[in-house]
């Protein structure tokens, strides 16, 4: 199993904790509102909204909350207007970071970002400083026991499959072309294969392998960033070395 897959496993474990944070629904509501504003309130004709609703429902968000967020996006209800801004920078050990935000106050957000980065051995960079290292892809997590790698390949071969990575819990992370995420989800559903956390992801061309001490520092920084209500997603090119996983689990 690659170090990147190990990091995916850690992120999956972290998600259970993240869901206890008060900011989870805030982030989901923002994404639904923005998606509805950009592409309309009908999920059948708005793939981004459809994906946002699926994510919200998988995290047990009540339908009333989802509908209110949609109506705020379409203007049927009064709501806050959000700007989507992407920041780039570096974390400990030279790890590249892309930070996607949705904010109603740009000055507050960038001040918070600088504060978090400076306290955690990170720094913001210029636009384009690290984005060239990443490509946007579709990503689907398939939990352990849902399917074998061979079954996934058979089901997804004609649905935009680009890569399958295993994790320590027997599950898989499926990577697709950015335009084929919906097709891959549909193929899994038709095959009766359970999946979770289907999303658009930013995958780096190359990874930097870290030992446990540096990996802890990067994870601490990412935790701090993800704890901010204005930050929707954080992507990095961190890979965890083969010998570091046990230390990180301690």
Curated annotation (Swiss-Prot):
MF GO annotations: DNA binding
Pfam families registered for this protein in UniProt: TACO1_YebC_N, Transcrip_reg
Localisation per UniProt entry: Cytoplasm
Organism domain of life: Bacteria
GO terms under cellular component: cytosol
UniProt key word Transcription regulation: yes
GO biological process: regulation of DNA-templated transcription
Keywords: Cytoplasm, DNA-binding, Transcription, Transcription regulation
Keyword Cytoplasm: yes
InterPro entries attached to this UniProt entry: Integrase-like_N, TACO1_YebC-like_2nd/3rd_dom, TACO1_YebC_N, Transcrip_reg_TACO1-like, Transcrip_reg_TACO1-like_dom3, YebC-like
Homology family: Belongs to the TACO1 family.
Protein name per Swiss-Prot or TrEMBL: Probable transcriptional regulatory protein Cvib_1432
Species: Chlorobium phaeovibrioides (strain DSM 265 / 1930) (Prosthecochloris vibrioformis (strain DSM 265))
